[in-house]
UniProtKB/Swiss-Prot annotation:
It comes from Oryza sativa subsp. japonica (Rice). Residues 243-306 bind DNA. A zinc finger (ZF-HD dimerization-type) spans 39-90. GO terms for cellular component: nucleus. Coiled coil: none annotated. The gene is ZHD10. It comes from the Eukaryota. The homeodomain differs form the typical one by having namely 4 instead of 3 extra amino acids inserted in the loop between helix 1 and helix 2. Residues 349-359 have a biased composition (Gly residues). One of its GO terms (molecular function) is zinc ion binding. This is Zinc-finger homeodomain protein 10.
Length: 359
């Protein structure tokens, strides 16, 4: 007989904590490997001990050939030698969603209606050919209505009815031409298809360009010109223009006393003279501010400053009087009056003997 030896299996003990951890690590490795991640530049600060900041410049994590997925400590970069945790982890970007289908563009707006076209008239012969039918139709209607009108009017009105009927026939014949032209006109051609960018002129614009509206436009131009001359002034402006500024009026005695006070003060107000000015203003009967303004306005009139210069400028701008005409001056040294007197004396002495040149 064979002896059956009981074999007991010992669980594998791992240094990082039991057999369950290995199984859990295997189960977790699958989703980690399924979700791939990209590791970019290295962010390790090599100057942290010095209180600064310096990186090695590695741009992307490169796994080392000796790296083992089961040993996390072996996951170092082959370029900079730093662990993978120092590199910036960039998860794989999710796939871009499908492009959304844009809605179809809206249909173009319908073209505007075409402008009204003038009606086409048939020749006169066609209108005359259709007119008798309308005349017969109108006379038949009047014959149907005639018995009732005869009973109302009596037998004495037949002649008037016949005359009125003749007039109606003539009117019907005149109107029938117009009706025939409208009814016998051929079918209108379908309106042309216009492009979306074409904008026909409005009816009122077409009418305004006609010759019939020219007088109306010309008549409206004077009113437009009168309106363009300028808007009427607002009512407030008229009242402000009519309102006059209040001016203080002084008596001759007040003017003399204020002139005397101004000359006493030297036509200048100073702080030391405030008491004198207040007392004199009360005696004169004017306020201190009014006296100050009067003195400022009349200072140049009495001192001969600005007013004197103004009068001198006005005198210089006045035209000069023309120089006097000297009638007594002569080139030969004798006056004009003396020469005239000598000539008169010579003429008188000669008498009828004639002039000295004649002898």
């Amino acid at each position: 007989m064979e002896a059956v030896v009981g074999v007991k299996y010992r669980p594998v003990v791992f240094p990082n904590g039991g057999a369950a951890a290995a199984a859990a690590g295997k189960s977790k490795a699958t989703p980690a490997s399924a979700t791939a991640a990209v590791y970019r530049e290295c962010l390790k600060n090599h100057a942290a001990s010095l209180g600064g900041h310096a990186v090695d410049g590695c741009g992307e994590f490169m796994p080392s050939p000796a790296a083992d997925a089961a040993d996390p400590a072996s996951l170092k970069c082959a370029a900079c030698g730093c662990h993978r945790n120092f590199h910036r982890r960039l998860p794989e970007a999710p796939p871009s969603p499908p492009l959304l289908a844009l809605p179809p563009p809206p249909p173009p707006p319908p073209p505007p209606p075409p402008p009204p076209q003038p009606q086409q008239h048939l020749p006169r012969t066609a209108a005359v050919a259709v007119a008798p039918q309308l005349l017969l139709h109108g006379s038949h209607q009047r014959r149907e209505q005639s018995p009732e009108t005869d009973r109302v009017r009596g037998p004495g009105h037949h002649h008037d009815d016949d005359a009125a009927a003749d007039d109606d026939d003539s009117e019907d014949s005149e109107m029938s031409d117009y009706d025939d032209d409208r009814s016998a006109s051929p079918l209108q051609a379908p309106p042309p298809v216009l492009s979306p960018g074409y904008l026909p002129s409005a009816t009122h614009m077409l009418l305004s360009l006609g010759s019939a509206s020219a007088p109306a436009v010309a008549a409206s131009r004077p009113h437009a010109a009168a309106a363009a001359m300028g808007p009427p002034p607002p009512p407030g402006a008229a009242t402000s223009a009519s309102r006059k500024r209040f001016r203080t009026k002084f008596s001759p005695e007040q003017k003399q006393r204020m002139q005397a006070l101004s000359e006493r003060l030297g036509w200048r107000l100073q702080k030391r003279d405030e008491a004198v000015v207040d007392e004199c203003c009360r005696e004169i009967g004017v306020g201190k501010g009014v006296f100050k303004v009067w003195m400022h306005n009349n200072k140049h009139n009495f001192l001969g400053g600005h007013s004197a210069r103004r009068s001198a400028a006005a005198a210089a701008a006045a035209p000069l009087a023309p120089p006097p005409v000297l009638t007594d001056f002569s080139i030969n040294g004798s006056s004009t009056h003396a020469a005239a007197a000598d000539h008169a004396a010579a003429t008188a002495s000669g008498g009828g003997g004639g002039s000295p040149q004649s002898t």
